[in-house]
Regions:
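Membrane-interface helical sensory segment of bacterial ECF anti-sigma factor regulators
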Residues: 1-17
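Surface-exposed amphipathic alpha-helical segments
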Residues: 119, 125-142
Length: 142
């Protein structure tokens, strides 16, 4: 299948809409998940969600930082939205895949949103972790 992303930058949100030409992926590969956890972060097992087409995890640290990982098989008209009012967006890459990085700085608290598509799977990582750790987490997902 061919997956096409349309990014729309609206006044208060950034919207990602996918269209699919062909038969979309219907299940995640077996054991598909992140394989790197930054030092000081712990998986919140109570919030973990996993089924055949999605996995969601959140991690927290002792100093109250948190980040979320969401990976979902893309179907036609899949939509995801993000804050655009306080976020600066730029193009980047994750494992040679085009990606979009959002940086939010509110009163000195910096957080990131990193989104990309690979092999019919939508990936997003949101939260308060270093930029280096953000990319290490992203590159570990398989």
């Amino acid at each position: 299948a061919v997956y096409t992303a349309l990014l729309r930058f609206l006044p208060i949100e950034m919207q990602v809409t996918y269209s699919v030409d062909g038969t979309p992926l219907d299940t995640l590969p077996e054991n598909y998940c992140d394989h790197y956890v930054p030092e000081g972060f712990v998986l919140d097992e109570s919030s973990e969600l996993r089924d055949s087409y999605q996995f969601f995890r959140s991690y927290h640290s002792a100093d109250d930082r948190i980040y979320f990982i969401d990976c979902v098989t893309i179907n036609d008209s899949f939509i995801s939205t993000f804050d655009n009012e306080h976020t600066v967006w730029q193009e980047t890459n994750v494992n040679d895949c085009p990606a979009t990085l959002g940086t939010t700085n509110i009163q000195g608290h910096v957080s990131y949103a990193l989104i990309w598509e690979k092999d019919g799977i939508y990936h997003s990582i949101l939260g308060e972790l270093s930029l280096t750790d953000l990319y290490l987490v992203a590159e570990s997902i398989s």
